């Protein structure tokens, strides 16, 4: 995590103090369950809560102990014993470090997912608002970067809305998959600990018991979680890239909001660059980069090793913090996006009507021309216009072979922009419902 791309709401989840608070809660809830089962005295379990529930753990002290013990959980338990006193000997009874570490990580990941779902909701809200504003604003659709046929700018935003709706569903599913708890002891057999302890801790921490753990929670769950973040990041970049292309000087159909006093270049005072979209492109690359180590973490030796640990200490905070920042930036970008319908119309007109070529092709075939002949007739009139030599509709009306099939009025009819937009309402209802 670097502060430049970190929001405090997400950062707090990954702070050391938060981690130690979660560790304490796991240990204390486990002690409660062990007390109910008669394994440890009930007074000892109560004392753990009473003496440490509201404590601010001394992170520096824990780090000091870890430098000697070379073990983070033992360092924490040692510091906890300094706070709790004699009753601390009943803490971590019959548990192993992975019980604490893995359960804590999943608590943090579920909390992060909750924030990310809220972030996606902000993006969806902004997209829906702007989509309805420009539901019928005509613009050119492009394939391979080349003018194809008319769409509306509202449809472009509706595409993104549908994509982020899917992203939200995937994230909710990934959150559910990662929300498991393991308090199963060494090698996961419950040999030293009653499974009811795990069930109690799971309920207390708003998790579900891991059906079968091998001392660690299986990392395919985490791989799915981070893969989901990677897909969401790809969606962020797809929309950011669309904005970057549409802000090109020679296109200028949209533009990022440019605030009073903002500067675009240290050398060229006229510049207004799509810096937010470019920033999002870079952030998305980083989130996707964390997917690979998450996948590789699935492969652990036998019942456990800690090859996953060092990677997760980096990818868990970095991926969630970065995506959180990116989604919030994207929501603001869409909300303030400057949209230029007049430039959209001007760009549509640049090719002299060629964007209606498919309608002419279909009209000719419906009047009796073979598809091959119809294609040749449309193509031979389109290519001069592509080179800037005339107007498509005019050339078609001057072509004797075309006139065998279509009258001037029928040719003109094929250039109706509204024809391309007749099902926009239907598409919007599919995407947004009846609202």
Please provide the spans of the model-predicted regions:
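A structural signal for small-residue-enriched, beta-sheet-centric alpha/beta enzyme cores
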Residues: 189, 202, 209-216, 345, ...
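Long, amphipathic alpha-helical stalk/connector segments used for oligomerization, subunit docking
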Residues: 286-369, 377
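Acidic, glycine-rich loop-and-beta core segments that form the ion-binding/anion-interacting portion
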Residues: 198-291
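Short amphipathic alpha-helical segments with heptad-repeat character
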Residues: 110-121, 128, 158-161, 165, ...
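C-terminal alpha-helical interaction appendages
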Residues: 336-405, 418-421, 426-435
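Glycine-rich cofactor-pocket loops
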Residues: 132-154, 253-257, 261-271, 302-311, ...
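A helix-coil-helix interface module used to build multimeric assemblies
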Residues: 1-184, 190, 194-200, 209, ...
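Residue-level signal for inorganic ion chemistry
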Residues: 38, 280, 323, 374
